Amino acid sequence: MNPALFLIILIAVTVIISFKGFEDSYFFSKYQFHIGSIRKGEHIRMITSGFLHADIAHLAFNMLSLYFFAPVVYGELGNYSFLLIYFASLIFGSMLTLYLHKNDYYYSAIGASGAVTGIIYSAILLDPNLQIILFFIPIPAHLFGIGYLLYSIYGMKAKNDNIGHTAHFGGAIGGYLFTILVHHQILLENTFMVVVLTIPIVIMAVMAKQGKL
């Protein structure tokens, strides 16, 4: 399948399901990430929550980020590796969220953020010189990626919305590990970026260990 069409289908499916969630509160509640329900055996929520969003702004940000970063990943690795990294990042995000909030039975979250963060990390690893245009200003993509995760630390500490900030970190870890797994030459080709992108992950791990998240 044409890679661009492949991406458009993924975005379209996410948009359709998200809008269904906007309009149908029962549907939204049934498929969102919810600790109590997952611990009762509804593990499908760890995947379906990645197709739901809090509002149009949340959906638009994730889909635009995916649209801009995904071509680097499927362009370098192909459609199947792109899908592997996307869903591995989504699942890693859900697993980390479940681990950190396992005793909070009422904790809930939604969003493709974990999967998208994994794709962002993957794209930066594959193309360290990648730049994005933010408010008409070109900035290095790795600064965007690190800033995105640092913002996630704030969101995890604030806990004032329904967005899966914890999933951002799990997604970053998934994207990082699976990109190296499918393209291990990157360890030698882009060693500096491989090291740089561990910084926010290490910060989060230390804060979690100290009980600050």
Please describe what each predicted stretch is.
Residues M1-L213:
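A detector for small-residue-rich transmembrane helices and their helix-helix packing motifs
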